[in-house]
């Protein structure tokens, strides 16, 4: 069995904020596989089987505790199903990666992401996989806490939709083929807009006609 946790905050006012991109990804996975969300203590969960029959059992999780207490939702599920850290994937926003980047990482510190921080605290280990989706550092003058709770801009919508689609693809690969395959296939993902090519110098055609003195 695999546990896939999408980090975010409950409430419609947070649904389209940067901090909730993990929820968007697990919602897309649930939609693809026809899984239905239902409440389970401090979380909403959706169960599915992925891959060829009978398939790998997967429990998608959206903590309902607010970000900073995500471990309160994850810990009891982790214990109930007697899981090892290798069976857990946390889908999170990442301030340290530019918007448009997506990558897997195994273990390591929380990097200031308070949902990951609390999961590490509750589980007592860092040794679980994360799927990190870049939201970029805040612009000058922004507090990071305000930035992660800000809404996506209209001009970001197309890239966001593609990131969510690829994020769901990445979750499916992790479940079916493991972390190494996920890293190989997705850690080079870069959806940042490419700058227009620099204009090339104009080359004037040589004048083949006769030259006359003025």
Swiss-Prot record:
- Pfam families assigned to the protein according to its UniProt record, in alphabetical order: Pept_tRNA_hydro
Database matches in CDD domains: PTH
Q: Where does tRNA bind?
A: 14, 66, 68, 114
Site-annotated residues for Stabilizes the basic form of H active site to accept a proton? 93
* Catalysed reactions, as listed in the record: an N-acyl-L-alpha-aminoacyl-tRNA + H2O = an N-acyl-L-amino acid + a tRNA + H(+)
InterPro entries noted in UniProt: Pept_tRNA_hydro (IPR001328), Pept_tRNA_hydro_CS (IPR018171), Pept_tRNA_hydro_sf (IPR036416)
PROSITE patterns the record matches: PEPT_TRNA_HYDROL_1 (PS01195)
**Where in the cell is the protein located?**
Cytoplasm
The residues annotated as site (Discriminates between blocked and unblocked aminoacyl-tRNA) are 9
One example of the protein's molecular function in GO is: tRNA binding
Which residues act catalytically here? 19
Gene Ontology BP annotations? protein quality control for misfolded or incompletely synthesized proteins; rescue of stalled ribosome
Q: Where is this region: Disordered?
A: 185-214
> What start-end ranges are recorded for coiled-coil regions in this protein?
none
Output the Gene Ontology cellular-component terms.
Answer: cytoplasm
Q: Which UniProt keywords apply?
A: Cytoplasm, Hydrolase, RNA-binding, tRNA-binding
Q: What class of enzyme is it?
A: hydrolase
Q: What is its EC number?
A: 3.1.1.29
Is Repeat among this UniProt entry's keywords?
Answer: no
**Quaternary data:** Monomer.
Please describe what this protein does: Hydrolyzes ribosome-free peptidyl-tRNAs (with 1 or more amino acids incorporated), which drop off the ribosome during protein synthesis, or as a result of ribosome stalling. Catalyzes the release of premature peptidyl moieties from peptidyl-tRNA molecules trapped in stalled 50S ribosomal subunits, and thus maintains levels of free tRNAs and 50S ribosomes.
Q: Which HAMAP family match?
A: Pept_tRNA_hydro_bact
Q: Which NCBIfam families match?
A: pth
Q: What's the family?
A: Belongs to the PTH family.
PANTHER family reported for this sequence? PEPTIDYL-TRNA HYDROLASE
Designated name of the protein: Peptidyl-tRNA hydrolase
Originating organism: Deinococcus geothermalis (strain DSM 11300 / CIP 105573 / AG-3a)
Lineage, opening ranks? Bacteria, Thermotogati, Deinococcota, Deinococci, Deinococcales
Gene this protein is translated from? pth
